[in-house]
Amino acid sequence: MLCGCDEGTIYPDETIDSGRTASVTVTFKGIDAWPKENYLSLAAFGTDTQIPLLTKRISKPTIDGRERTVKLNNLSPDTKSINIAIISNGKKVIYSYCNQPVENNGENIEINFGELELASFKRIQSQVFKTNCLSCHGESSSGLAGNLDLRENTAYKSLVNVKAPVSEEGMNYVTPGDPHNSFILEILEENPIHKDMFNSTGKQEILALIKTWIQEGAPNN
């Protein structure tokens, strides 16, 4: 004798959507600067913009410049904004690219962030210089190491097309479009004082970020 099933739950409760969904359309540019140690994520934030309520890792696309849509399900009623951000394994916000405030009206959310440049100078300033470099290049009472000021309002003009005084080859710190003639990469890769500033994966992420930015013309973006 065959018996049919009643309306009992077939799937685990956690697979059932219980909140709103955010559908985000975005085009990634400069995917060679995709994070390696950290995670590029779609994230929902409440009133605290440093601790996400919910995150979803975004997988790296195979082709630069292709539009894609990413969804974030089960949004909390406390959600105040949807962001695309680089987030550490410990859920720390490393850098936020863009955010969209949202209302708690019960409706699903659709956002188009357009083109997102992964290798931006703002990301370099926030993720690299502000976190690791200012003690010697901006905040030291003994002066600027290498005559290089990496504070936010001066970093770009201190780097781009500026001769590095300690470069034996007379290279610029940054030569737009030419990573091989940009002394900043040599400093981070080979200089004894700087080469151990990051762990292996973190160093790969930083070097790829700066190299991609230089290859794309070193814009002040």
What are these regions (language model features)?
Residues 68-70:
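Short strand-edge motifs at loop-to-beta-strand transitions and within beta-strands
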Residues 5-22, 26-30, 35-56, 61-66, ...:
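Aromatic- and Gly/Pro-enriched helix-to-coil junctions and flexible linker segments
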